[in-house]
Amino acid sequence: MSLEMFDKEIFDLTNKELERQCEGLEMIASENFTLPEVMEVIGSILTNKYAEGYPGKRYYGGCEFVDEIETLAIERCKKLFNCKFANVQPNSGSQANQGVYAALINPGDKILGMDLSHGGHLTHGAKVSSSGKMYESCFYGVELDGRIDYEKVREIAKKEKPKLIVCGASAYARVIDFAKFREIADEIGAYLFADIAHIAGLVVAGEHPSPFPHAHVVSSTTHKTLRGPRGGIIMTNDEELAKKINSAIFPGIQGGPLMHVIAAKAVGFKFNLSDEWKVYAKQVRTNAQVLANVLMDRKFKLVSDGTDNHLVLMSFLDREFSGKDADLALGNAGITANKNTVPGEIRSPFITSGLRLGTPALTARGFKEKEMEIVSNYIADILDDINNEKLQENIKQELKKLASNFIIYERAMF
C-alpha cells in the first residue's frame, strides 16, 4: 500500500512542503538541499537494525553489513577532513557537542565560548542550554565592527581560565583564525574545541582554513554546508581523546545508532570528496559575495561589512524596522530567512535588529551570479518599502517564475 493510501494527511502535507521548497527561495544559512541518493538510503531497511556499540564490538548479532557501512562512513569522514579518528554516530550537532564536553571535561568545569547574541550557538555555553547548566560558562564576542578581537579573547581566557575553549559560530561571516585560538588555549592549558557545523562544507573544499591541526577536537553537523543528512560527527587526531569520545557517545549519551542515517552520511561524504563538490563550495562563497555587494551598494549595513563564507548578516540598527519585520516581509515574498541579533543589539532576541541570509540552498539549486544579483536586488526592494504588501506579492510571483527554472526535486519522497 502506498503512503498516499495509508496516511493521506502526512502524504499531502509532505507534498505541500515540496511545493514550498520548490516555489520559494530558501535563504536560511543553516538549511540546504540534500541529494536524492541520501534520502533514498535514509528510507531503506537499514532503519530496522539495532547496532549498539562500534564496528567489530557490537552488543547485538547480525551486524556484519552495518559494520561495513559504518566503517565506510568513518573512513570517508577521515579522508574528507584529513584526520586520524572520526565518530559518525552522533544524531545531531548538539549531541556531538554534548559528547565532546562529556569526553574532555567534568560537570562544573568552565568553558569559554562565543556569546549566543554575538553569533555563537546554544551549545557553546548558553544558560538555557544543558551546556550552560552542566558547566560554568563564560563568553567572548565580536566588536562593533562585527569581528572577533583575538587579543580580547586572550584577555578573557587568561582571566577566566576555562578548561575548554569553543571556537565556531552560527552567524559569523568572517574567517575563524583557528591557529590564534590554539595559541590562546595553549597559554592557559585548555582544550581547543572547534565546532565547524556552519562552515564544514567550505572547509573540506579548501574555501575556509581547516581547524586541523590546531583544534584538539572538531565537531560538525552533516547537513548545512555539507548537504548530507541531518546528523553530527566528531573528529580528532589524538587516539586517547578518540577513545574518550567514543565512550562519551556510546554508552554515555546515546544507545543504538541510526544506521540508515550513518549510511546516508557515507553517501554524503562520497559527494563531498568529489571534484563537483569543490565547484559547488566555491560557488556558495561567490554567491554570498554577490549578495553582500549588492546589499551594500543598495546602502544596507552588513555586520563586518561583507562576508568570507556562506552567509551575510544584515544590521537594521540604523533603520526603523526590526529583524522580525524584515523576516516577515521577505517571507511574504517567498524568501525564507531568519531574524538575528547583531553587535550593539537594542531589541529583544525575539524581535532583533538583524537578518541572517545564506547561499548554500540556492547554490544547490544552480543559482549563480546572475540569479543572485536578481534575488539580492529584490531583497533590497522589499526592505526599502517594507510595508508594501502589493510589492511583496509581485516579487513573490517573479521569484516563483525564477525558481521554476531551478527545480531541485521532482517528487517529495525517494
Curated annotation (Swiss-Prot):
Its cofactor is pyridoxal 5'-phosphate. GO terms for molecular function: glycine hydroxymethyltransferase activity; pyridoxal phosphate binding. (6S)-5,6,7,8-tetrahydrofolate binds at L116, G120, H121, L122, E240, S348, P349, F350. SUPFAM superfamilies: PLP-dependent transferases (SSF53383). It catalyses: (6R)-5,10-methylene-5,6,7,8-tetrahydrofolate + glycine + H2O = (6S)-5,6,7,8-tetrahydrofolate + L-serine. One of its GO terms (cellular component) is cytosol. The record marks H223 as: Plays an important role in substrate specificity. The modification N6-(pyridoxal phosphate)lysine is found at K224. Pathway: One-carbon metabolism; tetrahydrofolate interconversion; Amino-acid biosynthesis; glycine biosynthesis; glycine from L-serine: step 1/1. Belongs to the SHMT family. NCBIfam families: PRK00011.1. This is Serine hydroxymethyltransferase.
